[in-house]
UniProtKB/Swiss-Prot annotation:
Function, in words: May induce G2 arrest and apoptosis. May also increase cell sensitivity to apoptotic stimuli.
One annotated Gene Ontology cellular component of this protein: nucleolus
InterPro entries: FAM32A
Organism of origin: Danio rerio (Zebrafish)
Name of the protein: Protein FAM32A-like
Family stated for the protein in its record: Belongs to the FAM32 family.
Length: 109
């Protein structure tokens, strides 16, 4: 085991590559600057102009109709109770053909 006493333990050290130095902590100047920016932005929000709508008249009409149709769909769905909806669904299923039933096959007739 004495042959291994001269072996260097630890990470390899490469030539031309310096060790990464520890970064210094930023002082409170950064925090103070951020707080000032927040305060000034709050003051500017009150003085900003209102939002200018840049949509074309066709786009505005389309959005209005979409909203109207969505409200109609919501009112239509809200008009039926769950019980009524289940009854309608069962009635619909009764009218469908039954594809998955096993057909009766008789060899005698």
């Amino acid at each position: 085991m004495s042959e291994y006493k001269s072996v260097q333990k630890g990470s390899l050290k490469l030539k031309g590559v310096s060790l990464p130095s520890k970064k210094k902590k930023k002082k409170n100047k950064e925090m103070k600057r951020l707080e000032e920016q927040v305060l000034t932005s709050e003051n500017e929000e009150g003085t900003k102009k209102a939002y200018v709508d840049k949509r074309t008249p066709a786009q505005m009409a389309f959005d209005k109709i979409q909203e109207k149709r969505q409200m109609e769909r919501i009112l239509k769905k809200a008009s039926k109770t769950h019980k009524r909806r289940v009854e309608d669904f069962n009635r619909h299923l009764d009218t469908l053909t039954e594809h998955y039933d096993i057909p009766k096959v008789s060899w005698t007739k």
